[in-house]
Amino acid sequence: MSNKVHLGHTARKRFGQNFLTDQGVISSIVGAIAPDNDHVMVEIGPGLGALTEPVADMIDNLTVVELDRDLVKRLQYHPVLKDKLTIHQGDALQFDFGQLQQPGKKMKVFGNLPYNISTPLMFHLFEFAEQIETMHFMLQKEVVLRLSASPGTKAYGRLTVMAQYYCQVVPVLEVPPTSFTPAPKVDSAVIRLLPFEVKPWPCKNVDVLRHLVTTAFNMRRKTLRNNLKTLLSDEDFAELQIDASLRPEQISVPQYVAMANMLCDKKD
């Protein structure tokens, strides 16, 4: 049997499918998620149910978002899960997670995410951060390092700044390729994202922040002065007490927010 087949399903490369099979890792992740009936529990990419089954076992209802029609069909006819699942067949990148919120209940979102969409999916989920209590994701280890990076490090970038603007970021555990079928060519890790109830550095317009950060990191090796010359002057940098000769990875999240807020003030 091909090493890409698990429980009779062949992993599809175009969907980035790698199925988690290590029971010890599964137990650790479920413990970190802490499933309960006080939140709307949402799984992205349930696959063959490695996390779905133990989580659903602890709660009354689990909402899942799955793109693969074959896997959706398996879930719909699953002897144990079918009565506990609310299944949405579709692309999580296009999905309106806001529709899942219930009165008085925030969401707990989790999943073993396809690595080929993990970064854009993070940005999509940040748009619903105010409706989410916690997020737990299995990701490529490199992405976890980017999410949790500190200023001045190679991993620090656009994803870091936006993730840490919206959330407290906590690495949970590292997972070797042998924990999956088929084994991915990269190491994996689990991350916990805790959206802030009150943001420590409030931004007047997050679209402005997003544009500023994207522009700053378009050319990582160049200085802020060069990358942001169409947005901020030397006088602006001086007023903010930010050294314009620094590179984008040397600037902290609150400094990016301060620059974005200055841009908002200029537009008013």
Swiss-Prot record:
Q: Looking at the keywords, is Magnesium present?
A: no
Q: Name one GO cellular component term.
A: cytosol
Q: Where would you find this protein in the cell? A: Cytoplasm
The cross-references to Pfam families, in alphabetical order and at most eight, read: RrnaAD
Query: What GO MF annotations does this protein's record show?
Result: 16S rRNA (adenine(1518)-N(6)/adenine(1519)-N(6))-dimethyltransferase activity; RNA binding
EC number(s) stated in the UniProt entry for this protein:
2.1.1.182
Protein origin, superkingdom: Bacteria
What is this protein for, i.e. what is its function?
Specifically dimethylates two adjacent adenosines (A1518 and A1519) in the loop of a conserved hairpin near the 3'-end of 16S rRNA in the 30S particle. May play a critical role in biogenesis of 30S subunits.
Question: Which family is annotated?
Answer: Belongs to the class I-like SAM-binding methyltransferase superfamily. rRNA adenine N(6)-methyltransferase family. RsmA subfamily.
PANTHER family, per the entry: DIMETHYLADENOSINE TRANSFERASE, DIMETHYLADENOSINE TRANSFERASE-RELATED
**Name of protein:** Ribosomal RNA small subunit methyltransferase A
Species this protein is from: Shewanella frigidimarina (strain NCIMB 400)
Its gene name is rsmA
